[in-house]
Swiss-Prot record:
It comes from Vibrio parahaemolyticus serotype O3:K6 (strain RIMD 2210633). Its main location: cytoplasm. This is Elongation factor G 2. The lineage of its organism: Bacteria, Pseudomonadati, Pseudomonadota, Gammaproteobacteria, Vibrionales. GTP binds at residues 14-21, 78-82, 132-135. SMART domains: EFG_C, EFG_IV. One of its GO terms (molecular function) is GTP binding. Transmembrane segments: none annotated. Residues 5-281 form the tr-type G domain. Keywords: Cytoplasm, Elongation factor, GTP-binding, Nucleotide-binding, Protein biosynthesis.
Length: 696
């Protein structure tokens, strides 16, 4: 199939346990991809194919699947809902044209729903809304619609209404066609009847149809005027065209309801994917960037098979078949045997086997074109975010930017023979997940794993043990503290070394002060005359910048420091670049304490759900953890508490929360910002670091 208007690249995303993976399973059943529907409760779903996913009933990696509906090709990505795996959602949104946001009918707009929604807004991804689990106790479709409006600040365009609720939920009313779809209790998606709207819903259905038409027609002024002034109702085709335009422009979000688990309402969502979500040619084309500056060049990757190749590697995965590179093709074609250029490395790669993925199963293909999401087997030097292009037309697509890890653990193999095996395994895992980092402690020789949260690292350790057979000793989690300064000072430092023959000499006079939050390290020279020759300024900058990696208080990286070199001294024979670099390093060590060096700790944005009768206990516990409560929202099933809490106070929190709430509490957290440590905490952290270093 080469008609790009019949392509839909979509993602399914939501909060943990809202029913994304179950919804994907139902879609695959309806489109004929699978014949027996899997169930997350027993770990048999198609897209959750890792052992860790099947056991925990959560989606960790974004599984890609291709299927067909009404003569349209759907490339679907099922994304994780847990906040520790938000990187997968971000990575998927980067290559999608549309999406389905799944919300739990009883839980409503939950913490990760907000995060995913924010990312989708930033990526300008058109979305449908599916309010799922309306067969559940406490489900309330209209409450969730209100939350979408009030919490997310989005405009839901209600397309279906529930017939019955909780155990009485039997089907939906199609607001536009004014027909009822009623399923029997067999659980089979095809066992439904199209009926007249129940008598007690006729008025409500008519009211929602009027709202739908008025909202949709805001996209076409002529139709709106004819409707309001002359009472002329537009055709269904015109209404659908307006809905499609408004959906593409994020003016509103077509909203559907149902129960994926009970197979009710899914066909209408698939119809909506085809009717309202954009094809690859209808979204803004990907901008091209300057590889040196990262700035947009003003050129774009035109979505056409006739253009030179422009493709983005958005995911690396190592499975039982070997290394897979997932690729979104934006322009041109890619064929088996082609040679492509990796613009990030300047090296060429030969395209070997190309496959379409159905979760962890592969179907080999010979070629792909603009609009396709495929995987290539065995690419050697490609990483996430790299651009693959025609060697004769080099270009760079907008890169992916990933958050820094906030938590780390030390690991070592239980037996000596495991070191090499662990090194190979970790290398593959880092390639797969850019938010997972590794480094070696130079003094202790320990391997340090860094990630986005406890669950993130817990899963990584589990993969090392189970998938790669590496038995590990795992240290306690460590917080990624940072250091900074609080005062501006003026200082001078001289480096002088004489040991026969030519020596070393460098003198620098400098000002050091706190930089703006998020500025990192900035350096400038205002030296006039030749007291510090211009060719040595980069060496001074390099010396200071190198010391930013290890602060003076406890060896943590230093943030937001501004250095100005304004004068100094020079010796015609003994001065050199290395002498000035050493001087800058000594200056950093000398001046940081004088400039009020301060320890910073990561603060997490924490979102807790608790039954109402445990609110006091939960807030009291968060206060004891040095938390600052920002917001409290009462819902029908409990209370959501939002606040900022230091990461160091959140280890093991889920166990405490479950105990306090008799197992009914839930929480999520994501990094918010760095904040100064209280003195007593800073003193303890510094003492702990010194003690650990003494043991090395």
């Amino acid at each position: 199939m080469t008609d790009l208007s019949k392509y839909r690249n979509i993602g399914i995303f939501a909060h943990v346990d809202a029913g994304k993976t179950t919804s994907t399973e139902r879609i695959l059943k309806l489109t004929g991809k699978i014949h027996k529907i899997g169930d997350t409760h027993d770990g048999s779903t198609t897209t959750d194919f890792m052992e860790q996913e099947a056991e925990r009933g959560i989606t960790i990696q974004s599984a890609a699947t291709t299927c067909f509906w009404n003569d349209h090709r759907l490339n679907i990505i099922d994304t994780p809902g847990h906040v520790d795996f938000t990187i997968e959602v971000y990575r998927s949104l980067k290559v999608l044209d549309g999406g389905i946001g799944v919300f739990c009918g009883s839980g409503g707009v939950e913490p990760q729903s907000e995060t995913n929604w924010r990312y989708a807004d930033e990526s300008h991804v058109s979305r449908l809304i599916f309010v799922n689990k309306l067969d559940r106790m406490g489900a309330d479709f209209y409450k969730v619609v209100d939350q979408v409006q009030n919490v997310l600040g989005a405009t839901p365009l209600v397309m279906t209404l529930p017939i019955g609720i909780e155990e009485d939920f039997v089907g939906v009313v199609d607001v536009l066609s004014q027909q009822a779809y009623v399923w029997d209790e067999s659980g089979q998606p095809e066992n439904y009847e199209v009926q007249e709207i129940p008598a007690d819903m006729v008025d409500k259905a008519a009211e929602y149809r009027e709202m739908l038409i008025e909202t949709a027609l805001e996209q076409d002024e002529d139709l709106m005027m004819a409707y309001l002034e002359e009472g002329e109702e537009p055709s269904v085709e015109d209404i659908k065209r307006c809905i499609r335009k408004g959906t593409r422009d994020l003016a509103f979000f077509p909203t559907y309801c149902g129960s994926a688990y009970k197979n009710k309402g899914m066909q209408l969502i698939l119809d909506a994917v085809v009717d309202y979500l954009p094809s690859p040619t209808e979204v803004d084309p990907q901008p091209l960037t300057d590889p040196d500056t990262g700035e947009a060049t003003g050129e774009v990757a035109t979505v056409s098979a006739d253009e030179p190749l422009k493709a983005l590697a958005f995911k690396i995965m190592d499975d039982r078949f070997g290394a897979l590179t997932f690729i979104r093709i934006y322009s041109g074609k890619m064929k088996k045997g082609d040679t492509v250029l990796n613009s990030a490395t300047g090296k060429t790669e030969r395209i070997g086997r190309m496959v379409e993925m159905h979760a962890d199963e592969r179907n080999e293909i010979d070629s792909a074109q603009a609009g396709d999401i495929i995987a290539v087997v065995g690419m050697k030097n490609v990483q996430t975010g790299h651009t693959l292009c025609d060697p004769k037309h080099e270009c760079t697509l907008e890169p992916m930017i990933f958050p820094e890890p906030v938590i780390s653990i030390a690991v070592k193999p239980k037996d000596k023979g495991g070191s090499e095996k662990m090194g190979i395994a970790i290398g593959k895992m880092v390639a797969e997940d850019p938010s997972f980092q590794v480094e070696t402690d130079e003094e202790s020789g320990e391997t340090i794993l860094k990630g986005m949260g406890e669950l993130h690292l817990d899963i990584k350790v589990d993969i090392l043990k189970r998938t790669y057979g590496v038995e590990l000793e795992v240290g306690a989690p460590q917080v990624a503290y940072r250091e900074t300064i609080t005062q501006a000072i003026e200082d001078s430092y001289t480096h002088k070394k004489q040991s026969g023959g030519s020596g070393q000499f460098a003198k620098i006079d400098y000002r050091i002060k706190p930089g703006e939050v998020g500025s990192g390290f900035t350096f400038k020279s205002t030296v006039v005359g030749g007291n510090v020759p211009k060719e040595f300024w980069p060496a001074v900058e390099k010396g200071f910048a190198g010391m930013m990696e290890t602060g003076v208080l406890a060896g943590f990286p230093t943030l937001d420091v501004e250095v100005e070199l304004y004068d100094g001294g020079f010796h015609a024979v003994d001065s050199s670049a290395i002498a000035y670099e050493i001087a800058a390093k000594g200056a950093f060590r000398q001046s940081m304490p004088k400039a009020g060096a301060q320890l910073l700790e990561p603060i997490m944005k924490v979102d807790v759900f608790t039954p109402e009768d445990h609110v006091g206990d939960v807030i009291g516990d968060l206060n004891r953890r040095r938390g600052m409560i920002k917001d409290q929202q009462a819902g029908t099933t409990g209370v959501r508490i939002k606040g900022d809490v230091p990461l160091s106070e959140m280890f093991g929190y889920i166990g405490t929360l479950r105990t306090m709430t008799s197992g009914r509490g839930q929480f999520s957290m994501e990094f918010s910002h760095y904040s100064p440590c209280p003195n007593n905490v800073a003193e303890q952290v510094i003492a702990d670091v010194k003690e650990r270093n003494a043991k090395k």
